[in-house]
Amino acid sequence: MTSIAVVGSQWGDEGKGKITDFLGTTADLSVRANGGNNAGHTIDFDGKEFKMRLIPSGIFAAKLGAVISNGVVINPKVLLGELNNLEKSGIDTSNLKISNRAHIIMPYHIMQDTYEEEAKGNLKVGTTKNGIGPTYMDKASRIGIRVCDLIDPETFAEKLRFNLERKNALFTKVYGKPAMDFDEIYNEYVEYGKRIAKYVCDTSLYVNDALDRNEKVLFEGAQGIMLDIDQGTYPFVSSSNSVSGGIASGSGIGANRIKTVLGICKAYTTRVGAGPFPTELHDETGDKIRDIAHEYGTVTGRPRRVGWFDSVALRHAKRVAGINALSLNLLDVFSGFDKIKICVAYDLNGKQIDYYPASLKEVEACQPIYEELPAWEEDITGAKSWEDLPEKAQAFVKRISEITGIPVVTVSVGPDREQTIVLQDPWTL
């Protein structure tokens, strides 16, 4: 069995798309296991750039194709838009598989997301308003509409009518908003069901069969561990489990079928939206990192908050997700800096701690304790091997590995697939 689960080890936007693209060239099957179209990644293929929110990168190269599994919530309009864009560019999409157990994001989920965020006022969490949270809410309430329902017009009509009665009561009586029309939604979405039906199957069987044959299976995690609904900075989190355990359940496989958990991290830290961020920079250094690295959200376009590398948060991610290898991205950003800082612990009301508190109040009171390292002058974007990196850059990478207790297996020195230095092949771990 050869399998890798790629997980974001920070607050998302760590460069998972690049690493999954890099590993996807040698993977036999690529699987998306959680989240929805709130998570964007950019893939460069055959000289063209593709911005994807739902379809895994394996659609481009993997022998067995790409899977959208049961843990994903699917906006069929977004999905079909991505499929159309791929097909217009000559990409074969026939090898896409969609789980019959995945839940569907409905128009009322998007409206509910918007209304609830507006009603929260100062307590809003910065949702992307794509309906992700309300869809997972309905899933947990056991009233959600799944792919297998959408492709059965009779079942779909029954479940839509049941849900819309309740949503319209909520919209009109609580939020003072207009009701939504059954016929309009049904006619639009039943057509979506017809168009995606050919891709639908029991993806749990498909993925497990591939693992049984010892195919190389790449599981593409979305968001980041610090956005996990249980282990992240609650309530400023996503609505799904982004840890490796969530990838297992979201793919319909046993947890012991994931061989390597590859944590993706930047040489610094970023976050989009509200929520605690102990190492955040509010000075020229933060602005400099943001400008050099073009730190703006793939989906939202919002400027990302920037801070120094936080080893406390990463050790937390290691513990709860079982990370046993690291891919360190954007090392090239620090060329020309005088110094780099790594947060090694927190000061919480005069006490040094090395763990990430659950209490939001405690996290906000934490002050980072830094270790300072010298940066390097050289441009490293052309480095092809470990030996090509300056000694100071090597020292920084080694220190990250020492502090976190995780071996660094790849180092990224630029956005292109070729700008990836492999210290150890993740498929051989």
Curated annotation (Swiss-Prot):
Residues at which substrate binds: 298-304
Subcellular location(s) per record: Cytoplasm
Top-level taxonomic group: Bacteria
Record-listed Mg(2+) binding positions: 13, 40
Primary site of residence: cytoplasm
Xref: Gene3D superfamilies: Adenylosuccinate Synthetase, subunit A, domain 1, Adenylosuccinate Synthetase, subunit A, domain 2, Adenylosuccinate Synthetase, subunit A, domain 3
A GO molecular function held by the record: magnesium ion binding
First-level EC class: ligase
Pathway: Purine metabolism; AMP biosynthesis via de novo pathway; AMP from IMP: step 1/2
GO CC, one annotated term: cytoplasm
Cofactor, free-text remark: Binds 1 Mg(2+) ion per subunit.
Cofactor(s) essential for the protein: Mg(2+)
EC numbers for this chain: 6.3.4.4
Residue sites binding GTP per the record: 12-18, 40-42, 304, 330-332, 412-414
The keyword GTP-binding is assigned to this record: yes
InterPro entries to which the protein is assigned, alphabetical: Adenylosuccin_syn_GTP-bd (IPR018220), Adenylosuccin_syn_Lys_AS (IPR033128), Adenylosuccinate_synth_dom1 (IPR042109), Adenylosuccinate_synth_dom2 (IPR042110), Adenylosuccinate_synth_dom3 (IPR042111), Adenylosuccinate_synthetase (IPR001114), P-loop_NTPase (IPR027417)
Assigned keywords, A-Z: Cytoplasm, GTP-binding, Ligase, Magnesium, Metal-binding, Nucleotide-binding, Purine biosynthesis
GO terms classed as biological process: 'de novo' AMP biosynthetic process; IMP metabolic process
Active site positions: 13 (proton acceptor), 41 (proton donor)
Reactions performed catalytically: IMP + L-aspartate + GTP = N(6)-(1,2-dicarboxyethyl)-AMP + GDP + phosphate + 2 H(+)
A Pfam family hit: Adenylsucc_synt
Family: Belongs to the adenylosuccinate synthetase family.
Quaternary context: Homodimer.
Function: Plays an important role in the de novo pathway of purine nucleotide biosynthesis. Catalyzes the first committed step in the biosynthesis of AMP from IMP.
HAMAP family assigned to the protein according to its UniProt record, in alphabetical order: Adenylosucc_synth
Protein name: Adenylosuccinate synthetase
Provenance organism: Lactobacillus delbrueckii subsp. bulgaricus (strain ATCC 11842 / DSM 20081 / BCRC 10696 / JCM 1002 / NBRC 13953 / NCIMB 11778 / NCTC 12712 / WDCM 00102 / Lb 14)
Gene it is expressed from: purA
